[in-house]
Swiss-Prot record:
UniProt: NADP(+) binding residues: G164, R165, S166, I193, I236
Name under which the protein is recorded: Bifunctional protein FolD 1
EC number annotated for this UniProt entry: 1.5.1.5, 3.5.4.9
GO biological process, one term: tetrahydrofolate interconversion
Function: Catalyzes the oxidation of 5,10-methylenetetrahydrofolate to 5,10-methenyltetrahydrofolate and then the hydrolysis of 5,10-methenyltetrahydrofolate to 10-formyltetrahydrofolate.
Gene3D superfamilies, alphabetized: Leucine Dehydrogenase, chain A, domain 1, NAD(P)-binding Rossmann-like Domain
Entry GO CC: cytosol
Gene, per the UniProt record: folD1
Keywords linked to the UniProt accession: Amino-acid biosynthesis, Histidine biosynthesis, Hydrolase, Methionine biosynthesis, Multifunctional enzyme, NADP, One-carbon metabolism, Oxidoreductase, Purine biosynthesis
Catalytic activities: (6R)-5,10-methylene-5,6,7,8-tetrahydrofolate + NADP(+) = (6R)-5,10-methenyltetrahydrofolate + NADPH; (6R)-5,10-methenyltetrahydrofolate + H2O = (6R)-10-formyltetrahydrofolate + H(+)
One function term, GO molecular function aspect: methenyltetrahydrofolate cyclohydrolase activity
PANTHER family: C-1-TETRAHYDROFOLATE SYNTHASE, CYTOPLASMIC, C-1-TETRAHYDROFOLATE SYNTHASE, CYTOPLASMIC-RELATED
The keyword ATP-binding belongs to this UniProt entry's keyword annotation: no
Amino acid sequence: MKLLDGKKCAESLVADIARKVAGYEESGLRKPHMTVILVGEHAPSESYVKSKIKSCGNAGFEGTLLRFPDTITEAELLEKIRGINADPTTDGLIVQLPLPRHINQQHIINAIAPEKDIDGFHPTNFGRMTLGQKAFRPATAYGICKLLQFYEIPVWGKHCVVIGRSNIVGKPISIMLSNDFDIGNATVTLTHIETPRELLLDETRRADIVIVAVGIPGFVTEDMVKEGVVVIDVGINRLEDGKIVGDVDFENVKKKCSWITPVPGGVGRMTVAALMINTLMAYQNNFDLV
């Protein structure tokens, strides 16, 4: 069993981005600029946002955090987004999710200019990604692809089972791995927590790669996978004792794995790295550098 070290991979990707940014600065261009909007106080969101801003510094970017109280109205937040959309010095915009209940999340996602939507959630980017066209790919799914690529895990022609159908992870990773592009051409089965148990077991036990994102601690157990499987655990769950665990029963499942991601230290780092890649792409688009 070997670990798919997201920290090591992310640091390599961000260092490569920093070298490119240094070259652009030497030619007289400004730094890439990411803006993150955080509404209200939500401990996990605070942690995610801090890691994004820190990674901006490591990549040579400018990172701006805009905080708003959870009393902000949807109309007020939309107005803030329109202002950032019109700002030529901001390349990428993230609105940290989740949002307060009185704000329609999809309205906010749809309001972000597609050319600044580095999360890859806007329908325009999601549609282009689905069609295999150039787009900002959803960051967690893109990060998983980059992790597989970094460790040279074969994907072409492999049987991949995705557990979880969210628009953030499950759906985009199933599309990306089945598309004909640099890390794809797998045969993908998309399952979820409503998939009948026996059907789920039938699929996972035949899978070469299992990717799970359901938010249930220890959901994937040793009996669900075959020898030599590659397991990607997207889950981040905090237990009552404060311990952070994934959706995989790590200590038992790892016995059968050829490769497995740890939690923490796996996919989370790759999500942030993918946001840096998308921000660089937005910046390059703005200056016609690609």
